[in-house]
């Protein structure tokens, strides 16, 4: 495996969305179907820095920073999932994207799947990894992260950990990558959240995870897009790693059997942020898959 790059060699682009500026990467040819890369918590378009170069020679690659994250503006919001839906919907319309291929991860997967379910005629393919799915009980949450995420979801304790101590950036993120993240990489991820007041989205997201039936509105939304995925013929590309976090190998095997038109790719060792452990394989497999769509 080649050395994993730490640089972010992309010019900044901004678009006004619902009165705020959202930052995004935009590279590659303008003809053909654009590929929309959606990150999750607590990351940004930086997560895709070593994957986009594999895809950009042939396809337009667009990677926004979700509202309140990365280089996007940080309005005074509660940062519920529905807030992100509103801003992402408006972002896609502001850029005039008629059809897209989605490349999605973590909460970016929930946003992407939810958008695809509502706009199926505009989706040519979905590549996904470590995506948000209903977790029926805490026993199915990875043991190494169980107590931490239960604490994140305990009102005062969770805010102390994530808002005051920055525990999602300093703890959860590096613990969910197999290799050690460098200080340069960690500083890229720290940069948007140096001030506690800006960490609201980092706290909200783990409290929206659909675990053990709560919160009910997110469980229902995620179950709805999972039902759609199991019925939709849209081409799917699922990356998984060992041991994984949200999609362990056994779950990947079940999905390979149950999802129509789904190809799976084993990236080797990986936890949650697979893009930080084997980006070249992910990027090259996406580039190989796209021409058939």
From Swiss-Prot:
Instruction: Please list the GO biological process terms of this entry.
Output: response to toxic substance
EC annotation from Swiss-Prot or TrEMBL: 3.8.1.5
InterPro entries with a match to the protein in the record: AB_hydrolase_1 (IPR000073), AB_hydrolase_fold (IPR029058), AB_hydrolase_sf (IPR050266), Epox_hydrolase-like (IPR000639), Haloalkane_dehalogenase_2 (IPR023594)
The pathway where this protein functions is: Xenobiotic degradation; haloalkane degradation
Q: Which domain of life is it from?
A: Bacteria
Where does the record place the AB hydrolase-1 domain? 34-158
Extract one GO cellular component term from the record: membrane
Any GO MF annotation of the entry: haloalkane dehalogenase activity
**Catalyses which reaction(s):** 1-haloalkane + H2O = a halide anion + a primary alcohol + H(+)
Main enzyme class: hydrolase
Q: Please indicate if the UniProt record lists Hydrolase as a keyword.
A: yes
Catalytic residues in the record = 106, 130, 272
Sorted UniProt keywords: Detoxification, Hydrolase
User: Per the record, what is the consequence of mutating residue 273 to F?
Assistant: 8-fold increase in catalytic efficiency for TCP dehalogenation
Could you give the subunit structure recorded for this chain? Monomer.
Q: Which family does it belong to?
A: Belongs to the haloalkane dehalogenase family. Type 2 subfamily.
Question: What is the annotated role of this protein in its UniProt record?
Answer: Catalyzes hydrolytic cleavage of carbon-halogen bonds in halogenated aliphatic compounds, leading to the formation of the corresponding primary alcohols, halide ions and protons.
The name this protein goes by in its record:
Haloalkane dehalogenase
Gene for this chain: dhaA
């Amino acid at each position: 495996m080649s050395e994993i790059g730490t640089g972010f060699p992309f010019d900044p682009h901004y678009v006004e969305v619902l009165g705020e500026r959202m930052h995004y990467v935009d590279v590659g040819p303008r003809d053909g179907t654009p590929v929309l890369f959606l990150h999750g918590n607590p990351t940004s378009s930086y997560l895709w820095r070593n994957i986009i170069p594999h895809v950009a020679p042939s396809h337009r690659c667009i990677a926004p920073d979700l509202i309140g994250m990365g280089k996007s503006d940080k309005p005074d919001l509660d940062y519920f999932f529905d807030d992100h839906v509103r801003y992402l919907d408006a972002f896609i319309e502001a850029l005039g994207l008629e059809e897209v291929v989605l490349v999605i991860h973590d909460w970016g997967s929930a946003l992407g799947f939810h958008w695809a379910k509502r706009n199926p005629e505009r989706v040519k393919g979905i590549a996904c990894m470590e995506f948000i799915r209903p977790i029926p009980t805490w026993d199915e949450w990875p043991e190494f992260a169980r107590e931490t995420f239960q604490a994140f979801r305990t009102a005062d304790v969770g805010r102390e950990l994530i808002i005051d101590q920055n525990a999602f950036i300093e703890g959860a993120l590096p613990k969910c990558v197999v290799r050690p993240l460098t200080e340069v990489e960690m500083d890229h991820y720290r940069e948007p959240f140096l001030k506690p007041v800006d960490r609201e989205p980092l706290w909200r997201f783990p409290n929206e995870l659909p675990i053990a039936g709560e919160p009910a509105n997110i469980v229902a939304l995620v179950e709805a897009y999972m039902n759609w995925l199991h019925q939709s013929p849209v081409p799917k590309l699922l990356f998984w790693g060992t041991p994984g976090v949200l999609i362990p190998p056994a779950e990947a095997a079940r999905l390979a059997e149950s999802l129509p038109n789904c190809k799976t790719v084993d990236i080797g060792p990986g936890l949650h942020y697979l893009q930080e452990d084997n980006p070249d394989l992910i990027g090259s497999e996406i580039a190989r898959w796209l021409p058939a769509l």
